[in-house]
């Protein structure tokens, strides 16, 4: 696996890999603020009474949902590629009845709906220290990320987080800017070409089996899965449920069949039953594959990651 390969470059996803999202209450507050900016932008363009008479909060939610729905539609039409987000916004506005919507308005509305990274994301505690250690050990570091927003504001946001101390922005592959999204191999090659690295010399770290692991495996990039903490917790609950069920069934069976033939000590020992295998990364992977089987069914390639880690700092025991 690792010992058979000369890895000199490590690529990272961003969301749920290097950072996590703020709590839901704060997210909704940030969303509301940007929604209201979008409403102001719209009302400065049109005096349509249907919109001007609508409560600002309601109109803001309507705008966001309409744009997000149109983006999802565009993504389904051309899998593996990002839609033209401005054009998509114009189409969403036109569907709402704003027939005069143009690219200028679409661009302004779409930008107004952006939620900035420093306010809405938090780096994991071990992110910067792990990146610093890997860089010190001589690894080339890169980013391959699916994002609806890129451009100058995203560059500024990454500067604020401190991540640009470890990544060269011009060598990142950001789907909103590149026009291609994971798992399309082209977005990985975009980053690798800029970093002057061959696929077999690279590793990819990410939280998504379909986007990160599948995309990496299509190019023979070493794939490292860092599942979300919430997913790991969900799988542990499922494992505990199966453990308790198996234990309870065994106890019931033992008691029913042998209670009349054993003394108290023998009965207590028999009631323990066989302890199921402990929670492992293999169980976690099997749980996710079973849960998401329908979504992953069309995939013809083996999606099993080469490595599974819980925390980013676990990479330091590997590289």
Report residues per predicted region.
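Conserved aromatic-histidine-acidic binding/catalytic patches
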Residues: 2, 22-26, 30, 77-81, ...
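Conserved catalytic-loop position in the HRD/HxD motif
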Residues: 13
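Short, acidic loop-to-helix structural element flanking the phosphoryl-transfer center
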Residues: 5, 78-90, 103-104, 111-142
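A metal-dependent, Asp-based hydrolase signature
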Residues: 40, 50-111
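Basic, amphipathic juxtamembrane/active-site segments
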Residues: 24-42
């Amino acid at each position: 696996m690792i010992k058979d390969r000369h890895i000199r470059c490590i690529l990272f996803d961003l969301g749920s890999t290097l950072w996590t999202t703020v709590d839901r209450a704060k997210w909704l507050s940030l969303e509301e603020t940007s929604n209201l900016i979008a409403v102001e932008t719209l009302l400065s363009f049109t005096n349509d009474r249907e919109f001007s008479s609508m409560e600002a909060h309601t109109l803001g939610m309507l705008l966001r949902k309409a744009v997000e729905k149109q983006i999802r539609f565009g993504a389904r039409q051309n899998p593996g590629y990002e839609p033209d987000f401005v054009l998509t916004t114009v189409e969403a506005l036109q569907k709402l009845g704003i027939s005069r919507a143009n690219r200028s308005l679409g661009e302004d509305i779409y930008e107004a709906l952006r939620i900035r990274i420093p306010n809405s994301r938090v780096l994991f505690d071990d992110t910067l220290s792990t990146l610093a250690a890997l860089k010190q050990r001589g690894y080339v570091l890169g980013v391959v990320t699916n994002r609806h927003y890129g451009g100058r504001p995203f560059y500024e946001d990454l500067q604020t987080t401190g991540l640009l101390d470890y990544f060269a922005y011009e060598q990142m592959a950001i789907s909103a800017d590149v026009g291609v999204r994971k798992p399309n191999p082209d977005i990985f090659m975009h980053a690798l070409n800029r970093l002057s690295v061959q696929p077999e010399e690279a590793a990819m770290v990410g939280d998504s089996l379909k986007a990160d692991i599948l995309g990496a495996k299509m190019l023979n990039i070493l794939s490292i899965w860092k599942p979300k903490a919430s997913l790991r917790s969900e799988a542990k609950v499922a494992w505990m449920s199966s453990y308790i069920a198996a234990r309870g069934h065994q106890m019931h069976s033992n008691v029913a069949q042998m209670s009349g033939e054993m003394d108290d000590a023998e009965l207590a020992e028999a009631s323990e039953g066989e302890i199921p295998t402990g929670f492992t990364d293999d169980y976690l992977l099997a749980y996710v594959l079973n849960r998401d089987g329908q979504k992953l069914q069309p995939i013809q390639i083996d999606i099993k990651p080469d490595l599974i880690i819980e925390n980013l700092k676990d990479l330091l025991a590997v590289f």
